[in-house]
Design a protein with these regions (language model features):
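PLP-dependent aminotransferase-like
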Residues: 1-24
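Short hydrophobic/charged patches on amphipathic alpha-helices used for structural packing
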Residues: 25-29
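ALDH superfamily catalytic-core signature
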Residues: 6-8, 13, 30-32, 36, ...
């Protein structure tokens, strides 16, 4: 909020309201002063917002929703491999891969496939998973037990295609997941 105000946005144009979506969201969405909604989060919540907005009386207002997706990067022979690796590691694994904009699929041109894959495997093996407050940590835990199980089950379903997993030198009973490279065809 401070940065928006510092950039010149009028004070009356932006308010930060914290609270449970079910309690606050419904009230806000039904207020006739609301002329648009921008949302980042789950598809389930975006659907709830869309349904609430569709029941509003009066004009139809726009909804911009950024939800989870299968974001991908295409790598061809003109790409700088070192930059590709940096971008892929940051986008795919930082924030424990939990951003809705996190890289999920890396499509690599055949001519640069082996070099890129080998460098990506090397970089993945260097990732330190650990406590977020330690300077030596690259990646912290996922949000909860369900997220950990969902991710690990996905990895297990592709266990014969795993090309690399960073070491996990922390309590496996907590919410940590190994950053993993899975090779898929087509």
């Amino acid at each position: 909020v401070k940065l928006f105000l510092k950039a010149g946005l009028p004070t009356e144009s932006l308010q930060l309201l914290l609270g449970e979506g079910e309690n606050i969201g419904n009230i806000i969405l039904n207020d006739i002063r609301i002329k648009g909604v921008v949302f980042t989060g789950s598809c389930k919540t975006a659907d709830k917002i869309k349904n609430n907005l569709s029941k509003r009386k009066g004009e139809i207002i726009p909804l911009f929703a950024e939800t989870g997706g299968l974001n991908f990067m295409i790598v061809d022979s003109s790409a700088l491999t070192e930059q590709v690796i940096d971008d892929a590691i940051e986008s795919g694994f930082y924030s424990a891969g939990q951003r809705c904009s996190a890289l999920r699929i890396l499509a690599i041109q055949d001519e640069v496939y082996e070099k890129t894959l080998n460098m990506l495997i090397g970089a993945t093996n260097e990732i330190t998973v650990g406590l977020p407050y330690l300077l030596s940590t690259d990646i912290g835990p996922v949000i909860d037990h369900d997220a950990k199980n969902r991710i690990n089950n996905h990895i297990k379903s592709f266990s014969n295609k795993v090309k690399a997993q960073s070491p996990l030198n922390i309590d496996s009973h907590s919410f940590y997941v190994q950053p993993t490279i899975i090779e898929i065809d087509n």
